[in-house]
UniProtKB/Swiss-Prot annotation:
Tagged with keyword Hydrolase: yes
Signal peptide: none
GO cellular component labels: cytosol; exodeoxyribonuclease VII complex
Protein keywords: Cytoplasm, Exonuclease, Hydrolase, Nuclease
Gene3D superfamilies linked to this entry: Exonuclease VII, small subunit
Function according to Swiss-Prot or TrEMBL: Bidirectionally degrades single-stranded DNA into large acid-insoluble oligonucleotides, which are then degraded further into small acid-soluble oligonucleotides.
SUPFAM superfamilies reported in the protein's UniProt record: XseB-like (SSF116842)
Gene: xseB
Gene Ontology MF: a single term: exodeoxyribonuclease VII activity
Name of the protein described by the UniProt record: Exodeoxyribonuclease 7 small subunit
EC number(s) recorded for this UniProt protein: 3.1.11.6
One BP term from GO: DNA catabolic process
Family: Belongs to the XseB family.
Pfam name, any one: Exonuc_VII_S
Length: 83
């Protein structure tokens, strides 16, 4: 079952993954979740965090920087260096 739960994380949109991650954080912060369940939802939270990071990296790779010449005229685009 745990493998299925983690597998479905790989299909979530960024918005859905972040929403679920926020829900998990809130539940853990409330401190009313039994230990075993806390561990399980923490592990899912880690998977959701990795999914969000992966989707953000993909989005960054698609962003392009607009280039201009000395007079400010647009000359094209190049990959954005986000380091």
């Amino acid at each position: 079952m745990a493998e299925n739960a983690l597998a479905d994380v790989k299909t979530l949109s960024f918005e859905r993954a972040i929403e679920e991650l926020e829900s998990i954080v809130k539940r853990l912060e409330d401190g009313k979740v039994p230990l075993e369940e806390s561990v399980a939802i923490y592990e899912r939270g880690e998977a959701l965090k990795r999914r969000c990071e992966e989707l953000l990296r993909q989005a960054e790779a698609r962003v392009e920087k607009i280039t201009t010449d000395a007079s400010g005229q647009v000359t094209g685009t190049e990959p954005l260096d986000v380091q």
